[in-house]
């Protein structure tokens, strides 16, 4: 029996629906990400995606569940002195995805994956800056953020890595702008990094898996065979891939995007004209179809 689960969407409008998986599942997302990763956007779609990205830089993305780092100061320079690539590590909270099978990694702790990667690329400690997640000083449901804070603090101090603490009012976007490589474990800061043309590595699964603007290292073997930061796609390809992903997350994955409109994170209005057969077909076929399947052209 096919079933549908639903949740509020990442960026606000529409309804997030999954077929035959719970709301944390990645199968439906990955399929749509991959399907549209190489497809051109129309000018309208590109403008809509660009406007959504701009909101994150301006701190006006109020329809997302949480807005972090608003009004924080930008450091005048990179926090360390290095002549090699500046590596920014931006761990996510992972409080929402803990123990879900689609988000599992082969390493016991996220810092174990980071150790493997930093060793594989021969990173020096002066290359690395770690930006602690703001909600590590908060409790989210049964997830106590301080455990992550304690883990990363000890890891940074043991390895001599510079870190920006959770409570510090330092702009994460400013750090991204000054880095050469951004390493994440599924966090949405990949959007800002992609919009700035940065080299992005995701250590493990994420909502943007299936896209090409980010390099995914999800196994020990993939880290061992990683060739470093030189063999990379161009900045233009990163820009294009980021725009395509954002549009997919904004208006393809959510269902009824034009008819369920967010006023705040918890209040929505429903407009007339939505076609209920879309929901019926999802139940019949067991597949999520893009709410907007239109694509642009090269001209």
Predicted regions mapped to residue ranges:
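General small-molecule cofactor/ligand-binding pocket signal
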Residues: 4, 129, 162-164
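Short secondary-structure boundary/capping segments
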Residues: 13, 18-24, 102-106, 144-147, ...
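Leloir-type glycosyltransferase catalytic cores
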Residues: 25-74, 212-299
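Donor nucleotide-activated moiety binding/catalytic core segment of transferases
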Residues: 81-82, 104-105, 141-191, 195
């Amino acid at each position: 029996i096919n079933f549908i689960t639903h949740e509020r969407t990442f960026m606000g409008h529409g309804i997030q629906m999954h077929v035959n998986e719970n709301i944390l599942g990645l199968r439906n997302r990955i399929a749509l990400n991959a399907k549209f990763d190489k497809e051109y956007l129309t000018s309208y779609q590109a403008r809509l995606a660009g406007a959504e990205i701009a909101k994150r830089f301006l701190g006006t993305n109020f329809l997302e569940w949480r807005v972090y780092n608003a009004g924080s100061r930008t450091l005048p320079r990179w926090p360390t002195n290095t002549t090699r690539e500046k590596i920014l590590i931006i761990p996510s909270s992972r409080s929402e995805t803990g123990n879900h099978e689609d988000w599992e990694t082969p390493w016991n702790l996220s810092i174990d994956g980071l150790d493997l990667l930093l060793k594989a690329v021969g990173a020096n400690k002066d290359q690395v800056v770690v930006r602690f997640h703001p909600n590590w000083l908060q409790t989210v449901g049964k997830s106590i953020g301080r455990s992550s804070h304690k883990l990363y603090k000890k890891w940074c101090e043991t390895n001599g890595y510079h870190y920006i603490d959770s409570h510090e009012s330092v702009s994460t976007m400013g750090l991204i702008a000054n880095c050469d490589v951004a390493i994440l474990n599924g966090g949405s800061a990949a959007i800002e990094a992609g919009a700035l043309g940065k080299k992005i590595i995701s250590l493990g699964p994420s909502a943007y898996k299936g896209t090409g603007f980010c390099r995914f290292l999800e196994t020990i073997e993939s880290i061992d065979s990683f060739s470093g930061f030189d063999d990379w796609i161009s900045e233009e390809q990163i820009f294009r891939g980021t725009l395509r992903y954002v549009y997919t997350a904004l208006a393809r994955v959510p269902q009824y995007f034009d008819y369920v409109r967010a006023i705040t994170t918890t209040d929505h209005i429903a407009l007339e004209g939505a076609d209920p057969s879309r929901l019926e077909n999802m139940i019949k076929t067991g597949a999520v179809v893009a709410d907007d399947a239109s694509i642009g052209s090269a001209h």
